[in-house]
Amino acid sequence: VRSSAASDVYKRQNENETEAALADLEAEQDALWAEAQRLSDQLVAQQAANGQSTESNPGGYIWPVNSRYITSTMGGRNSPGGIGSTNHKGTDIGRVGYTSPVYAAKAGTVIISAYNKYRGNYVVVSHGSGNTTTYQHLSSRSVSVGTYVAQGQVVGITGTTGVSSGPHLHFEITENGQIINPLKYLTDYIKGW
């Protein structure tokens, strides 16, 4: 009986620690998203002050990797392997391995190229007017802050850095500061879930 009670206490403690870690992860993700949005807004203001266009690329989005295999969609989900957020803010594209190029889904300016313990290596590209794309869990980044990238230009290489259950690309789109489901635009995909 004593070992069962101790086991229950240990189990509850682990569950509490896991819940606290997930809450920290979600708070960190929200803070990073807010920082990306702030930088995007700052870039738009600078471009407007310099007389540059702040319009988004009207050409639409392209697939950021060659794979079309979706392993997790945006929104509520069971966290794979018990890691990561259950309120998924993007779309995970799998079957990419560790060496696939990641392409800018739209032309724009790199506002973040960094490493974070949750997102791993990641890149955020501003397309103007509060529109951004985010590429996470990269094994390496090919661009730096301030770089203008053309649509289809390589911004990094796929990987599994940060909180990740295996090699994939976590891809996010924001429009006018609101998170948008990437599958609204990237419609020719294979369901992997």
Sequence positions of predicted segments:
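Alpha-helical oligomerization segments with coiled-coil/rod-like character
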Residues: V1-P58
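Catalytic cores of peptidoglycan-degrading enzymes
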Residues: N57-W193
